[in-house]
Amino acid sequence: MKHLLTCCELPKCMLEYEDTLNDYDFVLYHQYLKDETYRNNYLNKRKTHPDRMMILDNSAYEFFVSGEKFIEEDFIRVIKELKPTYYIVPDVLMDYQKTFENFMRWIEIVPTISDSQPYFVPQGRTFDEFMDCAARMSSLIRFNNLPKNFCIPFHNDFFLDRNKLYSTKIKRLIFRRRELTKDEEYAYGRIVLMDKLTSLYPNYTFHMLGSHNPIEIKYYDIFDNIISFDSGYPVKLAISGVKLGEEKEKPNVIIDDFYGTNLSDSVKELIIYNVNKMRDLI
């Protein structure tokens, strides 16, 4: 059975645990810009561990939440400076039009970046918008001979509708007839989406961006081309004092809320417990 690579974004005081808790490095662009310790940590790791997989996130979710302006030229500079294995091409949450406009610009930019591969992120507020965005991207990726890599977001509203439209063995396998929480509905909706996407794009590599509930990773081994998954979910639960599996809902926090905080030993221990429990789901 294949191994799904996982990574949980850790607070600053626990960066030393990255290599033992995570299979690869997931670098948040906005933190890289703001925090010198964070930035130097990954610049040094790139030099000392050049073969370790590294993904540079574009921090679209964090920019969306904060309302701060994303400066594309700075992002390009950071890619060339850090030289990650992969970088995530800028997208706009649930906005098909703006995301596709970004994609069209990046068709010209990608060939100028020789040391890293792109991940492209389809977007859309509805299922049809999302699938149309993915189809148009795929057509141009093929025409321009670009890497066939897709990142799939976790937050799109239409995930909540997928379980109403599809009755599949996947849902029965995961949830065993009980009522789903809203977060589980999001997670199940994305599994159903991946069932569709992996059949339409069998030659693509997929990375799963974030999660509303990491129970979904237990079932990603049925999709051969999903290779990696990132989430702050186990850490956010621990910050809230909750063990993974005992939560009623996903905590409404982002990494910026706790990244620079000096955490107690008990919270650190709970973070380690939650991350390892998530990894055990695979």
Language-model segment annotations:
Residues 38-39, 65-67, 130-132, 160-164, ...:
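Short, charged, surface-exposed secondary-structure boundary motifs
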